Amino acid sequence: LRQGGLRIRDAYAASGSKGKKSDSTAELLKIKEEVLTDVYRVLSLCLGVPPTEFEWTMRDASDKVISTEKYTPKSFYQKYINADLDGNYVMLMNDPTREYGKVYEIDYDRHVYDGKNWVYVNLPIERIREVAIASLKDNTAMYFSCDVGKFANARRSLLDIANYDYESLFGVKFTMDKKQRVQTHASGSSHAMTLIAVNVDENGNADKWMVENSWGPDSGVHGCVVMTDEWFAEYMFRVVAEKKYIHADILKMLDQKPILLPSWDPMFAPED
C-alpha cells in the first residue's frame, strides 16, 4: 500500500514537471486501481475473499435459537436498523479547552476516508448529562467515549475517582482540572463504549452509570462496567444522541458554520 502511494506521488510529480498536471487525474486513478487490485489480492489470500452474505442466528435470553437467516450487510441493516443514521443523530462533546455553545469539525476524523468529518456541539457537562438521562430513560442506548484507563478498577468493574488515593500514596498534590489535562495530553478520548443505563436519585440526579464494553463477557460484569457520576464528569468526553432527546436550543446551534480544527487537536489526537 505504501509502495503504491509512492508510485502515485511520483506520477503526480512527473505530470507537473511536464506541464500536464491538470490532465493527470485519469492516469492517477488508473494507477490507484492497479495498486488496490494488488492490495485486494494480498488481503484475500491471507484472510479469504470477503463474503457477499452471512448467516446470523438470533437467540433469546435463555440461549434458545429463535431464527437463523442469511443476510447481506444492507439487508441486515434494513431489517434490524432501518434508521436515518446520517441526519437523526448529533455528537455532543464536553471539551473544556474550547468555547461552549459552538460547533466544531475535526479535519480528517471520519469513519471512512471518503466520508464526512466528525462535527460536534461543544457543551458543558450538565447539558450532556441531561441528554443522556433523557435517552436512557426512554431505553435508548448511546455511543459514548471516555478516558477509560483513568481510576479504573478492573476487579470491581468500577470507574470511580475515589478508587485510588494517589495524593496520600505519593505525598504529592495533583491539581490539574479537566481542561488542563486535555491541554497537556494527560487525558483525552481514548475509548468508545455503549452507554446503556443510569441510576437517578429521588431528585432525578444521576449518581452512577453503566456502559457495555467491547472486550467480551469476561471483562467487567458480563461485559459491563459501572462509573460514578463524578467520574463521568471528569473523564467522559462525548455521546451521540438522537435529536428527539436534545433540547431545541442545542439543536439550533447546528445552524452555525463549524469551526474547523486540525486532525492533531489534543481532543482527538490520542484516540485509539
PLM region spans:
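Generic recognition of cysteine residues
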Residues: 46, 143-146, 224
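Core regions of eukaryotic protease modules
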Residues: 4-137, 148
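Conserved catalytic-core surface of thiol
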Residues: 201-272
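Residue-level marker of positions within ordered structural domains that often coincide
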Residues: 1, 6, 137, 149, ...
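Helix N-terminus capping/helix-initiation residues
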Residues: 72, 124, 177, 228, ...
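Long, positively charged binding patches that form subdomain-scale interaction surfaces
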Residues: 112-193
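Glycine-centered flexibility motif
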Residues: 4-6, 11, 48, 157, ...
